[in-house]
A protein has these predicted regions:
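Cysteine-centered nucleophilic/redox motifs
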Residues: 63, 90-117, 133-134
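Catalytic cysteine-centered active-site loop
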Residues: 73, 79-80, 113-122
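Generic recognition of flexible, low-complexity loop/linker segments
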Residues: 48-52, 89, 117-122, 131-132
Length: 181
């Protein structure tokens, strides 16, 4: 029940290369019951959005901007699948991340969901729980936040877990952060 102090410094050095096995790549490319990247509707939106672009980072930029524009920011709209998000066109960060995952995978970009904390000034300076994505560019994972229309997210994003939010559920409501400057 003591305090842990964590100092964060923004490091502009590119992350180290992280080779993925074929099995790992397949895991982050495959459709799931929630991430319906193999559905005709998801494929059509993905193909229309990326067009003839082949660079995975540029594809991700196009997709995350499309998700940002498509979804009305509404914390009271919960969807369980990417197709529901596409149909309702509303939601919070979880819906943005869910739809982005499906569109990215449909475009052949390995992607995963990330859970963590995000700093914001509104309504007052503090950290909020947040969900965003990472794409694999063939060498390393790169953060993408379709809720805020950001590729290479800023230092205000504190990643806590990849994909499995259940593993960190016990932390919800227990983390306290004091912003010193």
């Amino acid at each position: 029940s003591g305090w842990t102090t964590l100092s964060l410094t923004r490091d502009f050095k590119a992350p180290d290369k992280e080779p993925l096995s074929k099995e790992q790549l397949q895991k982050f490319l495959k459709a799931t019951p929630a991430i319906q990247s193999d559905s005709p509707e998801i494929k059509a939106v993905s193909e229309r959005t990326v067009g003839s672009e082949t660079n995975p980072i540029k594809k991700a930029e196009l997709l995350q901007s499309a998700v940002f524009e498509l979804i009305d920011k509404d914390v009271n709209r919960n969807s369980n699948t990417a197709l529901e998000v596409l149909e309702r066109k509303a939601g919070d960060c979880t819906e943005h991340a869910l739809l982005f995952n499906a569109l990215a995978r449909a475009a052949g970009i390995p992607s995963r969901e990330v859970t963590g904390l995000m700093y914001t000034q509104a309504p007052s300076p503090q950290f909020y729980w947040h969900v965003w994505n990472e794409i694999y560019d063939g060498e390393r994972w790169i953060s993408v936040d379709p809720t805020w229309d950001e590729v290479f997210v800023d230092a205000g994003h504190l990643k806590i877990a990849n994909e499995d939010t259940i593993k960190i559920a016990n932390s919800f409501g227990k983390i306290k952060i004091e912003i010193l400057s």
